[in-house]
């Protein structure tokens, strides 16, 4: 987990229609100057995220008659594929929404510290903060909340089933997508330190002995399978099934604290 993901949904509870010929999204993502300080206005609905592919997923959901929460959850799962730096299902976040009756609700599904976490677990033997422990080790991982938060929001405020809104993310994971500047830069800057230590991650995000570059295709078959399980069985597939077993085993093997009980 590199950073947290925050997804906001506005004006939930009503269906949106999108203009027949909306302007095409800019072919850039965050970190590129061209997508900064260029406001866009819309009357019926709007989707914004850190990644253009994920944003298009949300727009498609609105076009199909979904509401803002349907779109937000679809975007959240799409970001789990297209923005692995922060949008992954191993993380957590927040959702703030305003229903058509004017009520504002906040859903907190931020990661929680595992039960075995202690106050001093990020200190070295001399009692000094150890940034590697707190940022890149298995100790740095909190119990994920994204899958539970998405499901809660969709159940209470959405209009579409999970199997439908998660489907675009599954397709992106299985078929892959072209790595953009932002992802390539982050894989080089952040991933070069962490990813080589984990063979499974290296097999996904590296090619020919180095991080994927802009223009390479990123395919995540295993993530697609995990998302398919969630689509079929809901959040229990993540927190109680084989996925939970694999997370717990990985943590135990590498000194992490998350257990299946968490």
Regions found by a protein language model. Give the residues of each.
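Hydrophobic h-region of N-terminal signal peptides that target proteins for export
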Residues: 9-18
């Amino acid at each position: 987990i590199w950073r947290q993901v925050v997804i906001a949904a506005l004006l939930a509870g009503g269906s949106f229609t999108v203009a027949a010929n909306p302007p095409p999204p800019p072919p850039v993502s965050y970190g590129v100057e061209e997508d900064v300080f260029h406001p866009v206005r819309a009357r019926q609905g709007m989707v914004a995220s850190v990644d253009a592919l994920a944003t298009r997923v949300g727009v498609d959901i609105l076009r199909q008659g979904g509401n803002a929460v349907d779109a937000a959850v679809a975007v959240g799962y799409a970001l789990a594929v297209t923005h692995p730096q922060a949008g992954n299902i191993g993380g957590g976040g927040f959702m703030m929404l305003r229903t058509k009756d004017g009520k504002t609700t906040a859903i907190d599904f931020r990661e929680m510290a595992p039960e075995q976490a202690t106050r001093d677990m990020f200190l070295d033997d001399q009692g000094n903060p150890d940034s590697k422990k707190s940022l890149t080790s298995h100790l740095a991982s909190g119990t994920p909340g994204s899958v539970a938060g998405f499901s809660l929001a969709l159940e209470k405020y959405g209009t579409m089933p999970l199997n439908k809104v998660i489907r675009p993310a599954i397709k992106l994971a299985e078929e892959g997508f072209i790595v953009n500047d932002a992802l390539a830069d982050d894989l080089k800057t952040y991933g070069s330190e962490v990813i080589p230590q984990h063979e499974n991650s290296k097999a996904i995000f590296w090619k020919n002995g180095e991080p994927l570059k802009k223009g390479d295709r990123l395919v995540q078959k295993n993530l697609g399978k995990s998302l398919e399980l969630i689509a079929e069985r809901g959040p229990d597939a993540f927190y109680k099934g084989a996925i939970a077993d694999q997370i717990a085993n990985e943590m135990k093997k590498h000194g992490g604290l998350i257990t299946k009980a968490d």
